[in-house]
Curated annotation (Swiss-Prot):
Cellular compartments annotated: Cytoplasm
Signal peptide: none
One biological process term in Gene Ontology: mRNA catabolic process
Organism: Baumannia cicadellinicola subsp. Homalodisca coagulata
Residue span, RNB domain: 191-517
A Pfam family the protein falls into: RNB
Purpose of the protein: Involved in mRNA degradation. Hydrolyzes single-stranded polyribonucleotides processively in the 3' to 5' direction.
Protein name: Exoribonuclease 2
Length: 645
């Protein structure tokens, strides 16, 4: 009868106001208790009983109480749940349905229900699903509760981890459907007939979505005329159509080890648009003359054409032939001549870029060899051999040409830009360089010319230490709608258009280039497409890293205790240890401080200068190569622990 009395309400409010409350994020442990992390320096203990009301990652408000002279946090209000939409593994016990969320720090089994819309889907223990959290104890419910919304895959799927990872990051798991009655929509565009030319393609032997074909011929005074034909999906896909919107949303083909999800329907990406051997295909073509020293003439020309590749070649075959290894031979003299001339183009353009732009140091690609059941058979390092460099030089040439044409004729497009060093950090760069006897001017370093000069100097050094130290002061590359320099490549302007089957921004540049030759109207891209491309690239890379880390951990698990030696590069130094990359297979591992030197007081891991000291003497530095073996592997969180030999 007194519960609504104003004095009683006032008294309750006064008591409430006296209690100290903190807002933070719940961090769980495998011991049952947890912590309320308020900031990087402050956290409060959450007893096991109270942890039953919350989940790792929840943002909550908690009351602080003193129990046995210790401050503890009692969860009170849910501000933001960690789980809303989530991926879970089906658990069935005593005919009751529950889910185990896909997260290494969440061990709670969450009761769940299957909606009527899935009544015909028989779920089994171990299947994977998408679910939404419906009930949370801090919202007044007795326990957590979730509703299943979609079956991802069954427990017997050998590639379940790939599909589950894609679902976890809310990425597509299947190729788009091919629309019925889709035909080429050239709308009066005249295509030149180049089907008699000996175009060749060079790619991985297993590649089906072939974007580019190349032809080289002699011009006047011994110059070489390079003709770069790029697949033309915009011949099939009208801007603003349903298929175009799907491609725009996906932004990229998503490549995972042994598994890819295309941006376009496979009928287009791997057949009708793919520049397959002996098949007549529509293409957008760039033709440019190259002088003996690799200089490009200003005669670059873009046009639409029909082409027919005369040979599908693989990187390994072509590299072996050029290097006089093995027994493979081109099918005829015409194909052999194309390879020879393309090799000449590569050497000249590479030499020109070393002198006038920048060339990245060759680093191997790492390829996972998977068995049919998805298990890792092996992981191999593939050096960037000559055939791959030949294609790269041709594509860079094509992109330089496109960037110049779009800049000079439109003033807009989708440009790949990189601004070099962060202007706010340039003084730190200068200080580091001067400490290593490299005299530089801050203003000059912020110019394209000055940046390139420094990069060339660093490339001549015997170690990568200094290069590694200053890379963290560089800005990230960006996609922009207006032309700008790409410091990383050492170029005044750069715009990609050579992968339209697998990258939507390249499709957009196709349309702009085609508008310049009379096909359609050139419309300035909206800036939101740059944000979409950047965000989707980030999501795809996270998913790729997730799958790769899991495969690495699964593969190296069997190496624990074997003392097999690996060469490794130190890529980062932290206060608590070193991060390394195994050079044989590309795996990232960590060496904790106690495995570097067992007397902690004698060890200094200096993150600021990238050096490890033992007893006051330098022992390791960033960029060094060391010998290690695998000490521990934890599959749940994909961590690989190594120890120095």
């Amino acid at each position: 009868m007194f519960q609504d009395h104003p004095l009683l309400i006032q008294l309750k409010q006064q008591l409430y106001d006296k209690e100290l409350r903190m807002v933070g994020v719940v961090k769980s442990t495998d011991k049952g208790f947890g912590f309320l992390e308020v900031n990087a320096q402050k956290s409060y203990f959450i007893p096991p009983l109270f942890m039953k009301k919350v989940m790792h990652g929840d943002k909550i408000s908690a009351v602080l109480r003193i129990v046995n002279n210790r401050a503890i946090a009692e969860p009170e209000t849910l501000i933001e749940p960690f789980l809303s939409r989530f991926v879970g593994k089906v658990q069935i016990k005593n005919d009751k349905l529950a889910l185990l969320p896909k997260h290494p720090l969440i061990k709670e089994i969450i009761p769940a229900s299957q909606p009527r819309s899935m009544k015909n889907t028989q779920l089994c223990h171990g299947d994977w699903v998408i679910a939404e959290m419906c009930h949370h104890p801090l919202d007044g419910y007795r326990y957590f509760y979730a509703k299943i919304t979609e079956l991802i895959t069954t427990k017997d799927d050998n590639f379940a981890h790939w599909r589950v990872t894609l679902a976890h990051y809310n990425l597509e798991r299947e190729a788009p459907a091919m629309p019925k009655y889709l035909t080429i929509q050239d709308n009066g565009l005249i295509r030149e007939d180049l089907t008699e030319l000996n175009f060749i393609t060079i790619d991985h032997a297993s590649t089906e979505d072939i974007d580019d074909a190349l032809h080289v011929a002699y011009g006047t005074n011994g110059a070489l005329v390079l003709t770069i034909a790029i697949a033309d999906p915009t011949a099939w896909i009208i801007a603003g159509s349903q298929l175009d919107c799907i491609a725009r949303d996906r932004a990229f083909t998503n490549y995972l080890p042994g598994f890819n999800i295309p941006m376009l329907p496979r009928m287009l990406s791997e057949d009708l648009c793919s520049l397959r051997a002996y098949e007549k295909r529509p293409a957008l073509v760039c033709q440019v003359t190259m002088q003996h020293d690799g200089t490009l003439n200003e005669d670059m020309r873009f046009f639409a054409a029909w082409i027919e590749s005369k040979a599908k070649l693989s990187y390994d075959e072509v590299s072996d032939w050029i290097e006089n290894i093995g027994f493979w031979q081109p099918q005829n003299n015409a194909i052999a001549e194309q390879i020879r001339m393309l090799h000449i183009v590569c050497q000249a353009r590479s030499s020109w870029r070393k002198q006038h732009a920048l060339v990245f140091k060759d680093k191997p690609d790492y390829r996972f060899i998977l068995e049919e059941n998805g298990n890792v058979k092996n992981i191999i390092a593939e050096p960037r051999r000559i055939a791959k460099r030949m294609i790269e030089e041709a594509m860079i040439t094509a992109n330089i040409c496109a960037a110049r044409v779009l800049r000079d004729n439109l003033g807009f497009g989708l440009y790949n830009t990189h601004n070099g060093f962060d202007t706010t950090l340039i003084d730190q760069v200068v200080a580091i360089l001067q400490k290593h006897n490299i005299s530089v001017d801050a203003t000059q370093l912020l110019t394209l010319e000055g940046f390139c000069a420094l990069r060339r100097k660093l490339n001549t050094m015997s170690t990568s230490y200094l290069d590694s130290r200053i890379r963290r002061f560089q800005t990230l590359s960006e996609l922009k709608t207006e032309p700008g320099p790409h410091f990383g490549l050492g170029l005044e302007v750069y715009a990609t258009w050579t992968s339209p089957i697998r990258k939507y921004s390249d499709m957009m540049n196709h349309r702009l280039l085609k508008a310049l030759i009379g096909a359609g109207k050139a419309e300035r891209p909206k800036t939101d497409i740059t944000f979409r491309m950047s965000e989707r690239r980030r999501q795809n890379r996270i998913a790729e890293r997730d799958v790769e880390d899991w495969l690495y951990a699964s593969f190296l698990k069997n190496q624990v205790g074997s003392h097999i030696r690996y060469s490794a590069e130190i890529i980062d130094i932290y206060r608590n240890g070193m991060r390394i990359r195994l050079l044989d297979n590309g795996a990232i591992a960590f060496i904790p401080a106690l495995l570097i030197h067992n007397i902690r007081d004698e060890l200094i891991c200096n993150q600021d200068i990238g050096i490890v000291q033992i007893q006051g003497k330098e022992r390791y530095r960033q960029g060094d190569t060391i010998e290690v073996y695998i000490k521990e592997v934890h599959i749940d969180n994909r961590s690989i622990i190594a120890k120095i030999v």
